[in-house]
Amino acid sequence: MKLGIIAFLVLIYGSFLYGQMSLTIEIDEFRNPKEGNILIAIFTDQLNFKNDISLKNWTVPKEKLIKGVFKETVKLPLGEYGIAILDDEDINGKMSYSFFGIPKEGYGFSDFNHSGFKKPMFSDFKFSVSDSTHIIRIKLRYL
């Protein structure tokens, strides 16, 4: 009986871990690396990105940066993803805009050098997690 339960748990646990890959996110060149928070969101498709429904999102206080660099590893199953980053300098949990609608805080996307004012499409910054280790370096943009 115990052997059956153990075998069942190993099967369930093994199925859960199968396909889990390591994704390391690296960000540096913060305008102010000491104050504020970093908001990270991982998206799986255009519809979820458009509706701001992330697979995973979290906030990291900049006090946790090491020498002004953010580096964190997450586990994800095989698939396509896109990462959006906000340098939340005023710690209000959202992008702050000027009177003219220009972002006041830094932002960035995975594998995408954003050069316009328009919000990108998911296809602009998506990438595939297809091997056991994947590193994404995100460049922040400040206007």
Could you describe each region identified by the protein language model?
Residues 87-89, 142:
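Surface-exposed loop/turn motifs at beta-strand-loop junctions within extracellular Ig-like
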Residues 79-85:
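A short tyrosine-centered beta-strand micro-motif
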Residues 70-76:
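Exposed aromatic-hydrophobic patches
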Residues 54-64:
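Solvent-exposed serine/threonine-rich low-complexity stretches and specific carbohydrate-binding patches
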Residues 92:
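Acidic carboxylate motifs that coordinate Ca2+ or other divalent cations, activating on Asp/Glu
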Residues 19-46, 54, 95-143:
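Primarily secretory-pathway and cell-envelope proteins
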Residues 62-68, 129-130:
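Short proline/glycine- and polar residue-rich coil/turn motifs
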Residues 1-23:
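Bacterial Sec-dependent N-terminal signal peptides
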